[in-house]
């Protein structure tokens, strides 16, 4: 969480208004970062086939934009989990600003604690968080997701992938993305296939 607890002001300097810290969906070359992030979230929410009253968990929810949009547009109830105290604080402010206290909550929680949480959800989403999990924990991550899914539930996983497995750059792993791994599609399909 230290990477995300640098302070929200630092991230505000270079992220767009959504405070989304993951890949955007640029439909057109002239799209702004803000448009790309909004378009990405809209596309993810469409793929989740949300209906009013459904429950949604966002693993690695960041500053909460995805859940806020899901609550406003689809009338879902949601829980976001993050390891960052700074993200949690800002997300709680955004929940209040949008008057969504009856629909959304954010927990300071590790995905590994989900099986014991008692939570159950119709939909689960994780955007740009799998890269932090590490190869040795992919299977545990998938089991944790499965443990909170209602029967017939849907899980959408968005991550950066590589064509093949590789250890990554030592300098980047030390100074930019400690513990981070870019998984291959094959790795994730093999684990998620169940």
Located regions from the model:
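Conserved SAM-binding strand-loop segment of SAM-dependent methyltransferases
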Residues: 98-112
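Substrate-binding/catalytic lobe of Class I Rossmann-like enzymes that use SAM or dcSAM, i.e.
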Residues: 161-194
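A short acidic, Gly/Pro-enriched loop at the edge of an enzyme's catalytic core
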Residues: 112-124
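N-terminal auxiliary segments of SAM/dcSAM-dependent transferases
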Residues: 1-13
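Conserved SAM-binding loop of SAM-dependent methyltransferases across substrates and taxa
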Residues: 63-74
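A short glycine-rich, Lys/Arg-flanked "PGG" loop and its adjoining helix->strand segment in the class I
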Residues: 139-152
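Conserved class I S-adenosyl-L-methionine
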Residues: 52-60
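Conserved beta-strand signature within the Rossmann-like core of class I S-adenosyl-L-methionine
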Residues: 152-160
């Amino acid at each position: 969480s230290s990477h995300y607890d640098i302070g929200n002001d630092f991230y505000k300097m270079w992220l767009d208004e959504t405070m989304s810290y993951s890949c955007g969906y640029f439909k057109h070359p002239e799209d702004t970062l803000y448009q790309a992030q909004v378009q990405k979230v809209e596309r993810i929410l469409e793929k989740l086939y949300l209906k009013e009253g459904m429950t949604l968990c966002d693993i690695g929810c960041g500053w909460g934009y995805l859940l806020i949009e899901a609550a406003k547009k689809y009338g879902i109830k949601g829980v976001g989990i993050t390891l960052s105290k700074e993200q949690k604080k800002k997300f709680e402010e955004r929940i209040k600003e949008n008057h969504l206290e009856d629909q959304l909550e954010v927990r300071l929680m590790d995905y590994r604690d989900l099986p014991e949480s008692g939570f159950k959800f119709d939909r689960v989403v994780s955007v740009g968080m799998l890269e932090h999990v590490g190869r040795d924990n992919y299977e545990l991550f998938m089991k944790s997701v499965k443990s909170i899914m209602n029967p017939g539930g849907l899980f959408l996983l968005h991550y950066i992938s590589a064509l093949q497995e590789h250890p990554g750059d030592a300098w980047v792993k030390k100074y930019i993305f400690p513990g981070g791994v870019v998984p291959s599609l094959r790795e994730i399909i093999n684990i998620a296939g169940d």
